[in-house]
Amino acid sequence: MFSPELHTSLAGITVVNFAINVPGPLAAQHLGQLGARVIKVEPPTGDPLGSFGRPWYEAMSAGHEIIQADLKSDEGRAQLSSLIDEADVVITSVRPSALERMGLAGLHERPNGPVHIDIVGDTEAPETPGHDPVSYTH
């Protein structure tokens, strides 16, 4: 049986996750199980993962700090930017143009910045919205 108190290899690491659906939250869940602090940023309407059912949402969010922010507003983007400035890892699942609109273009190029895990539906066409129903994080 998994016991979180025995898995602390990522203690002291902060993960900011604003990826939606399954792969991003699942990746964040794995990092949290290894001791990382996970901050999940959701839209004010909640994570679309909730449409899969409450048990699924709760399983993917267990142990995470949940913050709601409207990333389409200046205030929400400022809140996210502040979280990212303190993060060691950032998990996203948005198109490059959306990152640019949020002022986060080049997130992976920041000197001494966080590790950026970007989960996209199609690496050949990253601007095309999409989601692969198969999770490759296992």
What are these regions (language model features)?
Residues 1-136:
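N-terminal helix-loop segment corresponding to the beta1-alpha1 unit
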